[in-house]
Amino acid sequence: MHKGKKNYPNLITSFRMNLKKIILNHDRFSHPERWKTNALLRFTFVYIKFLFDLMIIKNPLRMVGKTNRDAVTALNSLQSNYANIMAIRQTGDRKNTMTLLEMHEWSRRIGYSASDFNKLNIVHITGTKGKGSTAAFTSSILGQYKEQLPRIGLYTSPHLKSVRERIRINGEPISEEKFAKYFFEVWDRLDSTTSSLDKFPHMIPGSKPGYFKFLTLLSFHTFIQEDCKSCVYEVGVGGELDSTNIIEKPIVCGVTLLGIDHTFMLGDTIEEIAWNKGGIFKSGAPAFTVEKQPPQGLTILKERAEERKTTLTEVPPFKQLENVKLGIAGEFQKSNASLAVMLASEILHTSNILEEKIKCSSNASIPEKFIIGLQNTKWEGRCQVLEKGKNVWYIDGAHTKDSMVAASTWFRDMVRLSKRKKILLFNQQSRDANALVNNLYSSVSPEITFDDVIFTTNVTWKSGSYSADLVSMNTSQEDVEKLKVQESLVKNWNKIDDNRAKTHVTASIEEANELIETLYDEPADIFVTGSLHLVGGLLVVFDRIDVK
């Protein structure tokens, strides 16, 4: 950029984010009913918005183009920052009960009603562990029936390397061109329409839904425009109040293994979490879940199914899959694959592609196309093995106790006979990182001992910058810059490991990778786990190295 030239789009984006922060932190905006009672406050903000509209700030991206990069920049401006998240948590208000009403309103403003989404023949999947893998398995199975279902949509979160991964057609992320095209169609429709401030007082002109809500809207728009015949939707968080729950008539619903996660939003107990997950159940849409759910959670799921006038069936691991090499590694994936078989069976039968549904029995016969779909499933960052030069990388994102135990057990079983050096690369910036490390350590010990342990941030590059698609505003920037979490992890590791491993701290993923390459001349097995932002950032670093 030339010296003295103003970067107006970035300045405007920064202003809009700070304005949003003021609104969210203001007591009246936190409670819409109070906003309604203060006409002066309403007038002030509407007038401010009018002035900025005159300055062509309503949509600054119109001035600089509508590329994929512009779309990602605009999308990142919709993230809630760390201060806002902490402020909301301090109020103790777990639920945004307006979410679904808002989603209906945002949908109206981009030209759709919820009933329009029924034509997508949706599989709706929730759960704590494995819902993304189950969604990928289901999509891959359906993809084997291309003649009858030429276009299959898949909506998942989070992404690893590129936000486009969240919106896939036939297993592949949509292109940069299509992402930008559909993104700005939604963005511009929202800019050109308004909502009633009496019904939606916080939807001031020019405002947008949050990051995940916007992407959910974008996914519906994309799949309808691309004429997808069936779509698989993974819930973002929970189910009852998740933005994907605007889906009124799914064909079938699935629930993967339940566990404790997102407690601020969903509750502290399995019962509360199960209640939220069961919120996706709909009348007339059968629901399936994996075997060996926590008993208390299963009881609540059954109650929710009865309440919603549908059935809930437990799916046993199919014996026919015992010797099948699934596209996603890990013994625990057999349960997810079995659930995917039942979900796909329901869609294919409803679409008159399968004459008979697959029986929900461990001895059931599974069609060859289903097996091929499970074998061909690709899902980066989950039990992934990569050979890079002399080293072998074992990569599996894990951010809950159960997923960390599963990931660590997978790594232990994969390398227990290996004589190579063992290196751990870990970060988890926003959850109880030390507790996860303790779960990891107890899962691999005493069979596996690490020679070196590296704790890094999720910052992508040595320069201190992030890959654009990996920008995250929901963690404390001060903690990242001061390496507070990483230093705490070092102390904890040295304590539980009795100072046997060499511990290291790096300020970026790129630095961590360079450190690993210089630690030993001999080959090493490297376990990368924790945050999916770490996993995605590492894969981005690998991509740049491969290009060079």
From Swiss-Prot:
**Binding positions (ATP):** 130-133, 382, 396
Q: Which SUPFAM superfamilies match?
A: MurD-like peptide ligases, catalytic domain (SSF53623), MurD-like peptide ligases, peptide-binding domain (SSF53244)
Q: Does the keyword Metal-binding apply?
A: yes
Recite the UniProt cofactor note for this protein: A monovalent cation.
The EC number of this protein is 6.3.2.17
| Pathway given in the UniProt record | Cofactor biosynthesis; tetrahydrofolylpolyglutamate biosynthesis
**What biological process terms from GO does the record include?**
one-carbon metabolic process
User: Where in the cell?
Assistant: Mitochondrion inner membrane; Mitochondrion matrix; Cytoplasm
Positions bound to Mg(2+) 2: 262
Annotated Mg(2+) 1 binding sites:
157, 234
Question: Which cofactor(s) does the record list?
Answer: a monovalent cation
Any one cellular-component term (Gene Ontology): mitochondrial inner membrane
Alphabetically, the GO molecular function entries are: ATP binding; metal ion binding; tetrahydrofolylpolyglutamate synthase activity
Q: Which InterPro entries does the protein's record reference?
A: Folylpolyglutamate_synth (IPR001645), Folylpolyglutamate_synth_CS (IPR018109), Folylpolyglutamate_synth_euk (IPR023600), Mur-like_cat_sf (IPR036565), Mur_ligase_C_dom_sf (IPR036615)
UniProt function note: Catalyzes conversion of folates to polyglutamate derivatives allowing concentration of folate compounds in the cell and the intracellular retention of these cofactors, which are important substrates for most of the folate-dependent enzymes that are involved in one-carbon transfer reactions involved in purine, pyrimidine and amino acid synthesis. Required for methionine synthesis and maintenance of intact mitochondrial DNA. Involved in telomere maintenance.
The protein's name is Folylpolyglutamate synthase
